[in-house]
Amino acid sequence: MSRDSSLITGTVVAVQANFYQVRLDPDASTEGENTLLADLPILLCTRRTRLKKIGQQVMVGDRVVVEEPDWNDHRGVVSQVFPRQTELNRPPVANADRILLVFALTEPDLDPASLTRFLVKAESTGLEVSLCLNKCDLVTDENLAQWRDRLKEWGYDPMFISVRSGLGIYEEATNDSQEGRVASSVQSHLQGKITVICGPSGVGKSSLINQLIPALNLRVNAVSGKLGRGRHTTRHVELFDLPGGGLLADTPGFNQPALECDPSELPEYFPEARQRLALGSCQFSDCSHRSEPNCVVRGDWERYEYYLQFLEEAIVRQQQEQNSSSAEASLKQQTKSDGTQQYEPKLQTKKYRRSSRRVQHQSLQDMCQEDLDEV
């Protein structure tokens, strides 16, 4: 059933293969024949060929224009992507406001090195970073207090929750036994924002989402007994509506995210280093904060050794990229008769290239003319 519709806009909530699920804006549903949208305000869309030709990707979280709606089959075509406020590549999410990093205090035990790697990766996105620690009911008050004080030194104020009991998910502490364990609820923290939830596998991300949005019933897996790590249960990125308002993006779990940042930017991803740089400046503008004199960052703070480790990784990665670019610049791609591609060394200009017959003929004519002139 077709009609001359006005501009229909919506948000991409899921991407699978070449199809996009678009949740339409509330004003997209109209009176009369389109009242079905009130019950199912999601259209399964394809991407306009023009967008593909210009290289315009469609990501989860994108604000888009939908054309050619088929209200009976709930189909449509994405014809335009609005400019993005923010953009993440891994995971691919557009227009996110915050990253909610979820870890477990135990089962598996909380590893400071792994937590730091995830925090640095989250900080590198430029989004607001919130830290949520699950399974607080399985550790002692002393252990929990130690982690709270430790993370405060790192520059973070974590939320302690228990997915199993619901503590810290829906409401703040309600009695003296919970006082000191729960400062604020996750539900209230996420309202009105597009939040990307991420963290290693097996820490309870899917279970947390099931608590926040019970109707989803996401599949969960137990932690591997042999490896002490979680099994991946989320395979693709998807946005879910939160009952209290806002959207939550579930992402596949990772055990060790890759750090892909410039070495000079790394200090900005450590709150401790940022604080020191805000209070003073190093003697050298390009200080790497390793062995340079009069450095304000180098010093006695817990994660400084992690900073040095990640800095070395970033430097090695940068050198590998530069070497790779140089190698690619010296090669050219050739297509063989069977259709396969292969790379061959490029010849230096005017060094190994043979002169054309025309140039050779012209040279012979010039030589003959010189001989005639001498005669």
Tell where the protein language model's regions lie, with residue ranges:
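Canonical P-loop GTPase G-domain recognition
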Residues: 138-203
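Conserved Walker B
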Residues: 105-106, 135-136, 251-254
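GTPase G-domain guanine-specificity segment
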Residues: 135-155, 261-270, 299-300
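Switch/coupling subdomain of P-loop NTPase systems
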Residues: 64, 96, 113-127
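Helix-rich effector regions associated with P-loop NTPase G domains
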Residues: 3-6, 18, 55-58, 68, ...
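Conserved beta-strand/loop subsegment of P-loop NTPase cores
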Residues: 96-103, 124-136, 155-162
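N-terminal accessory targeting/assembly segments
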Residues: 1-112, 364-375
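Walker A/P-loop
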Residues: 206-207
